[in-house]
């Protein structure tokens, strides 16, 4: 009898061959009918418009909203959107590099370096700063003391799950608005020409200020500081609300 391992291998070949055959025949037929390759049509009709939409404020805010919604539910939002997000970020960076190589000005602001500096870092760092400024809750301040170190490197899990921000309806609105405000400020700065578009791949975990400096020069540092300050201001009223909630809970227990 044929060994099971060999049988399994050949069984796996059947769907592979059928898939390749179907795509090949379909692509050939499309080429004969339309005069262009299927992959080219997909790029010009679907991918390129989506790339343009992703570089717009609406596209940026929609994907941030989806990401933050998953985080609110306790699901790692960045990992969920990563398969959809990263190809567009990589394409934008490649377009910027190609523009520089051709002696042109890069025009795609939203790259992975942009995401690291102006979307990832505003998640938990402004929360820590707002807590240190106005929060009277000992539990919040204890979490902030632990989370501030990782937050400087864009690691938000200690704050997200420690405070927690998960299922925290009081902090839901600022957790979305703060990121949108910081990233929107950066996008505006790029649009008006103050902050150059990123042409360097900035790795996740690059600390605050350095991430902006590597990706966007000194202008990026200025924009990041402004964005983080605005994001912190967004959190302050909600921290005051959290103070009152804690006082009410303590009064009810007494």
Predicted regions and their residues:
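Hydrophobic alpha-helical transmembrane segments
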Residues: 54-73, 106-125, 211-233
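Membrane-interface helix-loop-helix junctions at boundaries between adjacent transmembrane segments
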Residues: 1-58
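Transmembrane alpha-helix interface/packing and boundary motifs in multi-pass membrane proteins
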Residues: 65-78, 90-91, 153, 158
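Alpha-helical transmembrane segments and their helix-start/interface "positive-inside/aromatic belt" motifs
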Residues: 4-20, 73-77, 167-175
């Amino acid at each position: 009898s044929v060994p099971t391992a060999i049988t399994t291998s050949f069984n796996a070949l059947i769907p592979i061959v059928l898939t390749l055959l179907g795509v090949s025949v379909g692509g050939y037929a499309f080429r004969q009918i339309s005069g262009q390759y299927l992959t080219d049509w997909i790029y010009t009709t679907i991918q390129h418009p989506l790339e343009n939409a992703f570089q717009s404020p609406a596209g940026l805010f929609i994907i941030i909203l989806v990401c933050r919604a998953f985080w609110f539910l306790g699901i790692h939002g960045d990992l969920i959107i990563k398969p959809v997000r990263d190809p567009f970020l990589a394409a934008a960076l490649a377009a910027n590099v190609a523009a520089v190589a051709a002696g042109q000005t890069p025009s795609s602001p939203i790259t992975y370096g942009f995401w690291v500096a102006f979307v990832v870092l505003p998640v938990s760092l402004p929360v820590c700063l707002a807590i240190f400024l106005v929060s009277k809750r000992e539990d919040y301040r204890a979490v902030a003391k632990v989370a501030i170190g990782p937050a400087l490197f864009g690691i938000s899990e200690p704050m997200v799950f420690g405070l927690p921000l998960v299922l925290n309806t009081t902090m839901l609105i600022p957790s979305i608005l703060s990121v949108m405000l910081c990233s929107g400020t950066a996008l505006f700065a790029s649009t008006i020409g103050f902050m150059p578009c990123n042409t360097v791949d900035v790795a996740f975990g690059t600390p605050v200020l350095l991430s902006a400096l590597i990706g966007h020069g000194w202008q990026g540092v200025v924009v990041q500081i402004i964005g983080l300050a605005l994001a912190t201001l967004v959190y302050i009223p909600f921290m005051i609300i959290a103070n009152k909630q804690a006082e009410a809970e303590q009064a009810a227990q007494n």
